[in-house]
Each structure stands twice: as structure tokens, then as C-alpha cells.
Amino acid sequence: MKILYSLRRFYHVETLFNGTFVLAGRDQETTGFAWWAGNARLINLSGKLLGAHVAHAGLIVFWAGAMNLFEVAHFVPEKPMYEQGLILLPHLATLGWGVGPGGEVLDTFPYFVSGVLHLISSAVLGFGGIYHALLGPETLEESFPFFGYVWKDRNKMTTILGIHLILLGLGAFLLVLKALYFGGVYDTWAPGGGDVRKITNLTLSPSVIFGYLLKSPFGGEGWIVSVDDLEDIIGGHVWLGFICVFGGIWHILTKPFAWARRAFVWSGEAYLSYSLAALSVFGFIACCFVWFNNTAYSSEFYGPTGPEASQAQAFTFLVRDQRLGANVGSAQGPTGLGKYLMRSPTGEVIFGGETMRFWDLRAPWLEPLRGPNGLDLSRLKKDIQPWQERRSAEYMTHAPLGSLNSVGGVATEINAVNYVSPRSWLSTSHFVLGFFPFVGHLWHAGRARAAAAGFEKGIDRDLEPVLYMNPLN
């Protein structure tokens, strides 16, 4: 066997169970990678790598279609989506398909269509992936120079980056078009408890849109996660669309400047590490967004946020005890603070009790009861609507707490329902999808930088502690 690495250093650090194993005409001897290193064997085979990526896209779209149809088949219209463990139908409902006032599902056919379209798309992608992985040219450079590339070719790499940015920008514009012209989107803030509406008055002011980026991520500020009206969300997508499209055109037309050529490592593994870092950032932002935001992720579909369920409980008992004759404005709790109402650090009137920590929650069922100084006592006495009572009682019993095999909801709430909130699912999964790509980013960045600097990857076996330990037997 030809040795591709110094035996002293064990360059690739893979110890093979079966060093002679050949897969798709490639083995460790010719590629330097074992069979399980997957696409690493295809680093310099652009045609085969294209096949791997297209097939991967096919798997992703197949999951989306199959899971979509699975959720449609199991969907019960009489129960809220969040009580049924659904994670895809809420996204479709948020886009305004199949739902009406209050988030009630009127028609599941659009959901069925979505699932079938994704399945058909996945078949096309799957065929393309298999074709390019097994039958197509190993490398694209000779036959299709436009699609060919060399990892070190900085100009080609930024051109590919530009094409990706343009596609992302067009994706942002698709949401804008849906919201403005094609039926609108679901707005949880629509009067009377939410409805589908077209967005007419876009927020395009740069001070508002980019103001979100300058906010603190903590407390009531909440960075971009604090966005609470659809005009800002859709206006933000207009900005994103233009930035991505013009940035893409810029990257296609220009070559990297000298400072960029010096600052970056220009290799396949380096690009992988950059991509993983970006995915990691997306994962962490998505985690916070789905956990805290009830505008982009309407509580009608995803269930209440944690703070929302807590405030709903305080509101429900305020309503009950007020009916029983309690004076909610002056009743004292066991700590000497107000039992139902108290003041926040900045002087607003807020709910008392343990939920005081969530005083800066904003929710569509609660905001109509606020005045210029927080909760308005006269509105609490005279203006509470039946839909607000119903919704808060529902949210109170569906807190996004609990684990796979537990009773969901607040542990002390006797009416809680056995369920796990989609917010719990989506935020925990996206935290994991933020954390592990970050570890992968560090790993691949380290390898890429080591390779670029010219020293060998892996551990020097001469200094490995195990060499100096007594045998176990």
C-alpha cells in the first residue's frame, strides 16, 4: 500500500477497520479518506460532489413532503395545532393557507397540495442526485466550464457566493409577494383575535428595520426577536431581498480585494467551516425566535410562549376572582405586594404574583387592556371580552414546558394537558442545530487553517500519553 502520509504523524488520523474496502471505485489509498468520510472523497470531483449535494437536497425535500402529508393525515380540526405535535402545518398556516379568523383551520387541501409538490420535487432532485453521483461526469470543468470550479479560484468562489445570495434574495421576495398580493399572511394582531390579511403599509424606514439590529438582546429589548408587527417583518424581507440580490450581483461582478484574499483561507474545507458557522448562527437565532416571538410564530398555531402562558394564568384568575367580588386593584398578596396587580420597575401597572418576571410580555389578547401606564384598571373591570378569557384559559393550560414523556404545562397547574409544545420541540432542536454546527465549524476551521499554514493535521503520535502507559493485562 502506498503511504500517503508520514507514519510518524498519521496524517489523516483515520484508523481503518477494513483498509482495502472499495466504494464507487474509490478507496482510502487513492483518496486519503476512508469510506465513512463521505463527501471528503469527492473534494476534487466536482461532478460527483454535485450528485451528493443534489441527492441531499432531495432527501431534505422528501422529508418535508412526507412529514407534511403525515401531519395532514393525522390532523384533527377540532383541536389546536399545538396540541397535536405539528411543526409543519403551523408554518403553512402562518403563511395564510387554509385558515380564517382566530386561526381556525377551514381547509386542509392547501396543506395536501404542499406535501405532494414537495414529494414530486424530491423525486426530481433524487433522480438528479443519483444521475450525477453514478452516471454523470466525474468532474464538470471539462464539459461544463460554467459549472466547474477549483477551490483555490477565488474569483469563481465569490461568483458562486453571488449566485447563492441572489437565490436567497428571491426567496425573501417570495414571502413579500405572498403577503402583499397573493392572499396575505396570518396576523395574530388582527382585531378580535387574529385573521389572514394582506399587508398594505410596509415598514421600509431604515431606522426602524436596522434599529432592531442595534437593540440589546436582553430583557425587554430582545434584538430582532422583539419584532411584533407584520409590517416590520415583511418590510424587513424587502430590505433583505434587495441586500441579498445586490450583494449577489456585486460578488458576481467583482474579484475579492487584497485584504479579503489575505484574511480568508481559500479551500474546500475552509468554505465548509464558514458555512457551518453561518448555519450555527441561524440555528441559535431560530431557537430564540420560536421560543419568545408570538408574531412570526403565532400562538394560535405554535401554542403560547412561556411568558405568555404565565401571564395568561394571572389574567385568568384575575377574571375569576373579580367576578367573585375581589377588588383586584387593591388586594394584597402574601408578600405584601399586589395580589393581582402591581407596578413594574418603570412604573407601569403589571400583573402581580410570580408572573411579575414576565411583565414585558406583549400578546394580542392582552394589549387591548393596556393604557398609557400599563394595564388599565377601568378596562380590566369593564372591557374584558369573552374571546380574551377563552384564549388566556387555553394558553394557561398549555405552557411550553415538559419533556417527551412528561405531562406538559406548568407543574402546579391542575388543568394542564398532556402534551409537548411545538415551541419546545422547535427551540430545543434548533439550539442543538446551532451548537453542533458550531463545533463542526471549529473542527473544520482548525483543519483548514492547519492545512493552509502547512503543518500537518492530527496529533503527534510520539507524544501520545498512551505510548508510555503499562499494558492493561
UniProtKB/Swiss-Prot annotation:
The modification N-acetylthreonine is found at residue 15. One of its GO terms (cellular component) is photosystem II. GO terms for molecular function: chlorophyll binding; electron transporter, transferring electrons within the cyclic electron transport pathway of photosynthesis activity; metal ion binding. It is a multi-pass membrane protein. One of its GO terms (biological process) is photosynthetic electron transport in photosystem II. Residues 1-14 form a propeptide. Pfam families: PSII. It is found in: Plastid, Chloroplast thylakoid membrane. Phosphorylated on threonine residue(s); phosphorylation increases with increasing light levels. The keyword Transmembrane helix applies. Binds multiple chlorophylls and provides some of the ligands for the Ca-4Mn-5O cluster of the oxygen-evolving complex. It may also provide a ligand for a Cl- that is required for oxygen evolution. PSII binds additional chlorophylls, carotenoids and specific lipids. Disulfide bonds: none annotated. The keyword Protease does not apply. Keywords: Acetylation, Chlorophyll, Chloroplast, Chromophore, Manganese, Membrane, Metal-binding, Phosphoprotein, Photosynthesis, Photosystem II, Plastid, Thylakoid, Transmembrane, Transmembrane helix. The chain crosses the membrane at residues 69-93, 134-155, 178-200, 255-275, 291-312, 447-471. The modification Phosphothreonine is found at residue 15. [CaMn4O5] cluster binds at residue 367. Belongs to the PsbB/PsbC family. PsbC subfamily. PSII is composed of 1 copy each of membrane proteins PsbA, PsbB, PsbC, PsbD, PsbE, PsbF, PsbH, PsbI, PsbJ, PsbK, PsbL, PsbM, PsbT, PsbX, PsbY, PsbZ, Psb30/Ycf12, at least 3 peripheral proteins of the oxygen-evolving complex and a large number of cofactors. It forms dimeric complexes. One of the components of the core complex of photosystem II (PSII). It binds chlorophyll and helps catalyze the primary light-induced photochemical processes of PSII. PSII is a light-driven water:plastoquinone oxidoreductase, using light energy to abstract electrons from H(2)O, generating O(2) and a proton gradient subsequently used for ATP formation. This is Photosystem II CP43 reaction center protein. It comes from Secale cereale (Rye). The lineage of its organism: Eukaryota, Viridiplantae, Streptophyta, Embryophyta, Tracheophyta.
